[in-house]
Amino acid sequence: MVKWAVSILVNALLLIVIDGYIDSIHISSIGAAIIASLILSILNVLIKPLLIIFTLPVTMVTLGLFLFVINAITLMMTASIMGDSFQIDGFGTAIWASVILSVFHLLIQKGILEPLRKK
């Protein structure tokens, strides 16, 4: 439960950082970022596995790069659920944001969270 809550907060922080750097992404507040992160995590648990299974041949041919497209789809779904509180202006922006989210989440996970768990 604590790991999940930390993941929600890390994703919310990353969404806020991405909002600051990419003009095509708009998050209205910190609370909206936390709610968007919560919705995104729910979609990642419920919808993302189905998308991965249905697109497995494409994902294999692209050597896993299609997973960024799947992440972009879940980001766009999150934005459509959130309405005006979280907006992404295009699918290309969503792909770019999914790449940034994935890279930074991996860096935070491997560089900060895992070493803290080992102590």
Swiss-Prot record:
The chain crosses the membrane at residues 27-47, 50-70, 88-108. GO terms for cellular component: plasma membrane. It is a multi-pass membrane protein. Residues 1-23 form the signal peptide. It is found in: Cell membrane. Its main location: membrane. Keywords: Cell membrane, Membrane, Signal, Transmembrane, Transmembrane helix. Coiled coil: none annotated. Pfam families: Phage_holin_4_2. The keyword Iron does not apply. PANTHER family: SLR0284 PROTEIN. This is Uncharacterized membrane protein YvlD. It comes from Bacillus subtilis (strain 168).
